Curated annotation (Swiss-Prot):
Keywords: Ribonucleoprotein, Ribosomal protein, RNA-binding, rRNA-binding. It comes from the Bacteria. Pfam families: Ribosomal_L21p (PF00829). GO terms for biological process: translation. This is Large ribosomal subunit protein bL21. InterPro entries: bL21-like (IPR028909), bL21-like_sf (IPR036164), Ribosomal_bL21 (IPR001787), Ribosomal_bL21_CS (IPR018258). It comes from Azotobacter vinelandii (strain DJ / ATCC BAA-1303). NCBIfam families: L21. The gene is rplU.
Length: 103
């Protein structure tokens, strides 16, 4: 069984037992999270598509940990002016393990 959920402004295809890195949630490690915005639920040939969400469907997950992604470098360069600006960014994420899909 698989589902497509929306969290942090992004869509993720998830299956039970899968680990996933999503945008940071203010939830402690070991706690449970429920995703109510489920766009699609599939089980073999049986596929339910929401308009826009599937009624009564939810995905539960357990928070495994918090962390930061690798650094992304931003460089702004002005040609012929001897000017360069360098900036780095590391985005926070929450790692979750999908524990159940209910449709």
């Amino acid at each position: 069984m698989y589902a497509v959920i929306v969290t942090g402004g992004k869509q993720y295809k998830v299956a039970e037992g899968e680990f996933l890195k999503i945008e940071k949630l203010e939830v402690g490690t070991g706690e449970s999270v429920t995703f109510d915005r489920v766009l699609l639920v599939g089980n073999g040939d049986d596929v339910k598509i929401g308009a826009p969400v599937v009624d009564g469907a939810k995905v539960t997950a357990e928070v495994v940990g918090q962390g930061r992604h690798d650094k992304v470098s931003i460089i702004k360069f002005r040609r012929r002016k001897h000017h360069m600006k360098h900036q780095g960014h590391r985005q926070w994420f929450t790692e979750v393990k999908i524990t159940g899909i209910q449709a």
